[in-house]
């Protein structure tokens, strides 16, 4: 993480930059020539480079083999460019596909973009270079109709197999009322049921061998150990898992499409529901990305308040994860203890925000209101209460010999495998890599806090992942202690024209600010045309928002990258060859909710 200099970290995150000075731009030009690329200036904070489709695979291979390589395909998706008006200096395109890569050794990213015309919509698959490209490419085809040549199984992933059309195209309806009334006839019902029938041959699976007949078993989508509406089709030889196919999409709500019809301000409540246990943690990357577009620098008090709420929700989520993991292994009591502890967190959150699970409390340029009187006492009581409770969880359950025997060494993978599948969060850190965005790429003032990043001993297994989460809660309490003792004075909103809603006191004195308030609340603020990006360390891994503004009151394109999506894609590579009982332990150790997967 030494490649990012102090000077670079100190630069305002909302500066529009083309990153021509980034070493990777020079490396690419030395290899492919100075005229091979179009470098786009954005507020994403990373180099954005348009490349020719014919050179895409060669360039990706080059990045993968650099001395300090780009080893993770972090994200991949598309955009309908046909209605975008602010495209000066960019290659002509009806559609585009972007590829976001991370170099761990450099602590730097690069985003490649490919321009496509409507009558020639195809890109080559990256699955032979990055295996986690599989699901991302399926979703890109499904949402935009962009063909992926060479993909091993290009089929729908979020929508039913019988669905027609590509929902993220600009000419596709955004509201249910724009569709014709739906009528479920007997013929349609039979068709839907047939589409859910699993055909092993479609996935390259054999029904039998010369000596064995395989059994195919549906685990889910309503099995309690599936942790939501999630289905895994298992190919079994007795109790051994020969192969499996995760089936997602049952919780898909079109969160990215919603971003195109909500104002920048009114989309905030939707962010809470992306990962419904994370609360304010979900709001953080969105409001930071919007603030980059607007050029807003929030007061220090706002930064610390946001950190405080985020860490409260981090502990809240981890408590549920650890207790349900213990329940999956076979012990019931810790779940009930955990809900008692989580209630104490909700008491603090409700006193501050007025809500519990989904506060929708962060604002563009600040927070909804200042901290209430007495918040210090509530937080103090919680911080005094929790340490002994964590010790009890550890001693009575997590260090139990039965649990250790069921979890230690189960569903194990190393750092190279984690990076190849886009794994982040505790799953990656358990392999020994301390990649935590709060430390490596500080946001919202995290660089001012003293805390450690727990890591594992080189192999990420079910037991090491859960023990890391336990230590992460202790580190979150260290951060909360510092928030309590060092809360800065000052305003809870930035003094900026695009702060939404604007400061109320001004609307009572000036007609101009009253008009601004009315327009921003009714129509929403108008953001400058640009692109911005923000990643954060969420409760389950790295979460990010990649926003495209076309100079309107609404986002032109809202891309939500969640950690749980690649974590579930990784399942077959980890669990094949293990027992069904090991799969239950593995699922419990991942820490996911299906809203985070399906969006």
From Swiss-Prot:
<keyword id="KW-0813">Transport</keyword>
<dbReference type="GO" id="GO:0005886">
    <property type="term" value="C:plasma membrane"/>
</dbReference>
<protein>
    <recommendedName>
        <fullName>NADH-quinone oxidoreductase subunit C/D</fullName>
        <ecNumber>7.1.1.-</ecNumber>
    </recommendedName>
</protein>
<feature type="compositionally biased region" description="Polar residues">
    <location>
        <begin position="1"/>
        <end position="15"/>
    </location>
</feature>
<dbReference type="InterPro" id="IPR023062">
    <property type="entry name" value="NADH_DH_suCD"/>
</dbReference>
<comment type="subunit">
    <text>NDH-1 is composed of 13 different subunits. Subunits NuoB, CD, E, F, and G constitute the peripheral sector of the complex.</text>
</comment>
<feature type="region of interest" description="NADH dehydrogenase I subunit D">
    <location>
        <begin position="213"/>
        <end position="599"/>
    </location>
</feature>
<feature type="region of interest" description="NADH dehydrogenase I subunit C">
    <location>
        <begin position="1"/>
        <end position="189"/>
    </location>
</feature>
<dbReference type="Pfam" id="PF00346">
    <property type="entry name" value="Complex1_49kDa"/>
</dbReference>
<dbReference type="Pfam" id="PF00329">
    <property type="entry name" value="Complex1_30kDa"/>
</dbReference>
<keyword id="KW-1003">Cell membrane</keyword>
<dbReference type="InterPro" id="IPR001268">
    <property type="entry name" value="NADH_UbQ_OxRdtase_30kDa_su"/>
</dbReference>
<comment type="similarity">
    <text>In the C-terminal section; belongs to the complex I 49 kDa subunit family.</text>
</comment>
<keyword id="KW-0520">NAD</keyword>
<dbReference type="GO" id="GO:0048038">
    <property type="term" value="F:quinone binding"/>
</dbReference>
<dbReference type="InterPro" id="IPR001135">
    <property type="entry name" value="NADH_Q_OxRdtase_suD"/>
</dbReference>
<comment type="function">
    <text>NDH-1 shuttles electrons from NADH, via FMN and iron-sulfur (Fe-S) centers, to quinones in the respiratory chain. The immediate electron acceptor for the enzyme in this species is believed to be ubiquinone. Couples the redox reaction to proton translocation (for every two electrons transferred, four hydrogen ions are translocated across the cytoplasmic membrane), and thus conserves the redox energy in a proton gradient.</text>
</comment>
<dbReference type="InterPro" id="IPR037232">
    <property type="entry name" value="NADH_quin_OxRdtase_su_C/D-like"/>
</dbReference>
<keyword id="KW-1278">Translocase</keyword>
<feature type="region of interest" description="Disordered">
    <location>
        <begin position="1"/>
        <end position="21"/>
    </location>
</feature>
<dbReference type="InterPro" id="IPR029014">
    <property type="entry name" value="NiFe-Hase_large"/>
</dbReference>
<keyword id="KW-0472">Membrane</keyword>
<dbReference type="GO" id="GO:0030964">
    <property type="term" value="C:NADH dehydrogenase complex"/>
</dbReference>
<keyword id="KW-0830">Ubiquinone</keyword>
<dbReference type="GO" id="GO:0008137">
    <property type="term" value="F:NADH dehydrogenase (ubiquinone) activity"/>
</dbReference>
<dbReference type="GO" id="GO:0050136">
    <property type="term" value="F:NADH:ubiquinone reductase (non-electrogenic) activity"/>
</dbReference>
<comment type="similarity">
    <text>In the N-terminal section; belongs to the complex I 30 kDa subunit family.</text>
</comment>
<dbReference type="InterPro" id="IPR010218">
    <property type="entry name" value="NADH_DH_suC"/>
</dbReference>
<dbReference type="GO" id="GO:0051287">
    <property type="term" value="F:NAD binding"/>
</dbReference>
<keyword id="KW-0511">Multifunctional enzyme</keyword>
<keyword id="KW-0997">Cell inner membrane</keyword>
<dbReference type="InterPro" id="IPR014029">
    <property type="entry name" value="NADH_UbQ_OxRdtase_49kDa_CS"/>
</dbReference>
<keyword id="KW-0874">Quinone</keyword>
<dbReference type="InterPro" id="IPR022885">
    <property type="entry name" value="NDH1_su_D/H"/>
</dbReference>
